[in-house]
UniProtKB/Swiss-Prot annotation:
GO terms for biological process: D-alanine biosynthetic process. It comes from Leptothrix cholodnii (strain ATCC 51168 / LMG 8142 / SP-6). It catalyses: L-alanine = D-alanine. The lineage of its organism: Bacteria, Pseudomonadati, Pseudomonadota, Betaproteobacteria, Burkholderiales. GO terms for molecular function: alanine racemase activity; pyridoxal phosphate binding. Substrate binds at residues 130, 312. This is Alanine racemase. GO terms for cellular component: cytosol. InterPro entries: Ala_racemase, Ala_racemase/Decarboxylase_C, Ala_racemase_C, Ala_racemase_N, Ala_racemase_pyridoxalP-BS, PLP-binding_barrel. Signal peptide: none annotated. Keywords: Isomerase, Pyridoxal phosphate. NCBIfam families: alr (TIGR00492). The gene is alr. Pathway: Amino-acid biosynthesis; D-alanine biosynthesis; D-alanine from L-alanine: step 1/1. SMART domains: Ala_racemase_C (SM01005).
Length: 377
């Protein structure tokens, strides 16, 4: 039989999370962000849930082609725009919307021979300092785009750096909103400002809600402002479960160590379980398993923690308080466990010093992945 590890993808959880985004976004239209193969979940696996969105947003043309091949006829937005001039031909053929965030992209459009005008989102850098025109340069970019016969409607967008929580001494999104509104107040076109954190925390304000919101990490059941708020606070459901089983147990005596580097040393007699999961499966090698500083897991739905260093194919967990656990017991690394138990990916990520996004996207190809709705149909 194969190794007992598997990932389960829950499309109905994603559909539920998109409904929560809509509840916060009011009358704004909803982009479901599916970059990085739907944050590691697999576009095709979550496809039924995506039908509840108004548009699909991603990064590359391959993913755009995939959703068109799946039958999506609604708006598709390339969040980083075109990477070279020849991308415009496929944008035209697939009827893709694309972001314009630098001068070269305007030049490519000006030289492009198209059968139909392009729908673009002109991006302003309001403080994130990754992509976009400065407030001072935005109007000139808009004028140049508006003069091109290759361009149809021009929408406007920006991206928040601190929507999850304000930096000390800063004012969250207020300064970025003010810059965007001042620079665009007399320009026509739809607007898109809100990412996941802004949808949940700030969309009661009409200028933040605007015309389109972009639901990213919240769609997949991770809280964008964890640890301030967990998924229960936002009524989100994990759309991915990573689970395995115990394949061995060991009885330790005081002074015995566990794993490479002997990072964990038993202070008293204890029992541990060995789980068929390691960093080659996408579990973080740096997840701590030290005394007083360990990473949570569920065994048969009951919470315990890792011990020792994560290996390529295995990790160890503390069974001291779980006398019924043994070989074959189910281990939930994150997501939904048995008997209604739950281990949010954010809790694992926080212990490992990372974020849920990274764990989702790091799921290894060798892990068998199946689609399983949470609710019976």
């Amino acid at each position: 039989m194969p190794r007992p590890i598997e990932a389960l993808i829950h499309p109905d959880a994603l559909a539920h999370n998109l409904l929560q985004a809509r509840r916060h976004a009011g009358d704004a239209k909803l982009w479901a962000v599916i970059k990085a193969n739907a944050y590691g979940h697999g576009i095709e696996r979550v496809w039924p849930a995506l039908l509840g969105a108004d548009g699909l947003a991603m990064l590359d043309l391959d993913e755009a082609q995939r959703v068109r091949n799946l039958g999506w006829r609604g708006p598709v937005l390339l969040l980083e725009g075109c990477f070279e001039a020849r991308d415009l031909e496929l944008c035209s053929r697939l009827n893709l919307w694309h972001v314009v965030h630098h001068d070269d992209q305007i030049g490519w459009l000006a030289a492009h021979k198209t059968h139909q005008p392009h729908r673009v989102f002109l991006k302003m850098n309001s403080g994130m300092n990754r992509l976009g025109f400065t407030p001072q340069a935005l109007r000139s970019a808009w004028v140049r785009l508006n003069a091109l016969p290759q361009v149809d409607e021009i929408s406007l967008m920006t991206h928040f750096s601190d929507a999850d929580s304000p930096r000390p001494g800063a004012d969250g999104i207020a300064a970025q909103v003010a810059r965007f509104v001042e620079a665009t107040h007399d320009l026509p076109g739809e607007r898109s400002l809100s990412n996941s954190a802004a949808i949940l925390r700030h969309c009661e304000r009409a200028e933040v809600r605007a015309d389109w919101v972009r639901s990213g990490i919240l769609s997949y059941g991770s809280s964008p402002d964890h640890p301030q708020h967990d998924i229960g606070h936002w009524n989100l459901r994990p759309a991915m479960t990573l689970r395995s089983r115990l394949i061995a147990t060991q009885q330790l005596q005081a002074g015995d160590s566990v794993g490479y580097g002997s990072r964990f040393v038993a202070q008293q007699p204890m029992r541990i379980g060995i789980v068929a999961c390691g960093y080659a499966d996408g579990y973080p090698r740096h997840a701590p398993g030290d005394t007083g500083n360990a990473t949570p897991v569920l065994v048969d739905g009951l919470r315990t923690h890792t011990v020792g260093r994560v290996s390529m194919d295995m990790l160890a967990v503390d069974l001291s308080e779980l006398p019924a656990a043994g070989v074959g017991s189910e281990v939930t690394l994150w997501g939904h466990g048995p008997h209604g138990s739950l281990l949010p990916i954010d809790a694992v990520a926080q212990a490992a010093g990372t974020i849920g996004y990274e764990l989702m996207c790091a799921l290894a190809q060798r892990v068998p992945t199946h689609v399983q709705d949470l609710e019976p149909r």
